[in-house]
């Protein structure tokens, strides 16, 4: 089973091993994920489980969303996520909690990175700067040439240039689960995970550790 859970990033701290070694960890709160729909090959063409988490005011829920949540007999959440299933069955209303993971397990964590606004090529793509002297004037942080000549006569798609940096979907792979606190619904994951404090993250079993 390769499903994951939706959590909320609470911030970073550190814990100590019995030998006194300090381990930096990110604390992720795993509110019980409520199953809103179980998709099958017969009805949807593929197997998946759809979940929601958290709460949303009734005034912020559309009629279609309200009907979808009411059909599953679950409270409206702040979003809907879906995980593909290889095996196993779920029913609408089931809860998926932090106990899905165990200490020592490797996981992939997906979140939205912090937005940095408009950034130049040096900050955004780690370009080197131009010469500080030797005749250079007002061109110390410019990217340089962005193309060729009349042929091809255009700038190729994907060219690394200035633009909006951050605020994009990022996945960090193969992070270790240091501790699972089932009573407080917390996961302590070694290292940093994408996004700002309070942001939603998706925690899945590591794809590179499946065999």
Swiss-Prot record:
Keyword Ribosomal protein assigned: yes
GO molecular function annotation: rRNA binding; structural constituent of ribosome
Keyword Lipoprotein attached: no
Role according to the record: One of the primary rRNA binding proteins, it binds directly near the 3'-end of the 23S rRNA, where it nucleates assembly of the 50S subunit.
PANTHER family: 50S RIBOSOMAL PROTEIN L3, LARGE RIBOSOMAL SUBUNIT PROTEIN UL3C
Assembly and oligomerization: Part of the 50S ribosomal subunit. Forms a cluster with proteins L14 and L19.
Name the UniProt record assigns to this protein: Large ribosomal subunit protein uL3
Species: Pseudomonas putida (strain ATCC 47054 / DSM 6125 / CFBP 8728 / NCIMB 11950 / KT2440)
Lineage: Bacteria, Pseudomonadati, Pseudomonadota, Gammaproteobacteria, Pseudomonadales
Gene: rplC
């Amino acid at each position: 089973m390769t499903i994951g859970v939706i959590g909320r990033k609470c911030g970073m701290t550190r814990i100590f091993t019995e030998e006194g070694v300090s381990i930096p960890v990110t604390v992720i709160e795993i509110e019980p994920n409520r199953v809103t729909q179980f998709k099958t090959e017969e009805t949807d063409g593929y197997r998946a489980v759809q979940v929601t988490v958290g709460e949303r005011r009734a005034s912020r829920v559309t009629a279609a969303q309200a009907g979808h949540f009411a059909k599953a007999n679950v409270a409206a959440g702040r979003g809907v996520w879906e995980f593909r299933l290889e095996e196993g069955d779920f029913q609408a209303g089931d809860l998926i909690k932090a106990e899905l993971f165990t200490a020592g397990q490797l996981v992939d964590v997906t979140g939205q990175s912090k937005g940095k606004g408009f950034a130049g090529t040096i900050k955004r793509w780690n370009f080197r700067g131009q010469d500080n002297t030797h005749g250079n004037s007002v061109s110390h942080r410019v990217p340089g040439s962005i193309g060729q000549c009349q042929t091809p006569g255009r700038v190729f798609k994907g060219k690394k240039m200035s633009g909006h940096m951050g605020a994009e979907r990022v996945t960090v792979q193969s992070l270790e689960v240091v501790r699972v606190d089932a009573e407080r619904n917390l996961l302590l994951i070694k290292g940093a995970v994408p996004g700002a404090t309070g942001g939603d993250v998706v925690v899945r079993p590591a794809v590179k550790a499946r065999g």
